[in-house]
């Protein structure tokens, strides 16, 4: 392959492989809850405490008296890595959270469970919102949108990459 894509940058082991990263887009990581959940904003500190297992009930963040069902991504996920770096900031994830392997799974579980919370790429919320009953909550009172990600205002965002090895072929450059 001439080009590889990734939702994360190179880790320490990969930096010695001679790969050149090319930023192709900026992506927001949307925090999603069930449409019926009245909570519409969470701070990064509240998110950290939810994913660390310190906040366990929605009433602690202005919602109903309902247990929070924490949905996490698997360790191979670039989305999880970005969320861990930006939101968790060195705080470990609670080992009791459900770990799912894909965006669709996270979205489906959150749409079926009134108390669930998850995180997915912003593009999947907007493109599939009509067929699922999830909503993206604001983070630090900033709405998750293409505009706020592009402006740098939305706090949970990352770069998306293409990687090439050495000098890219003409086909790769045209792509």
Predicted features by range, described:
Residues 1-175:
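Exported/periplasmic ABC-transporter solute-binding proteins
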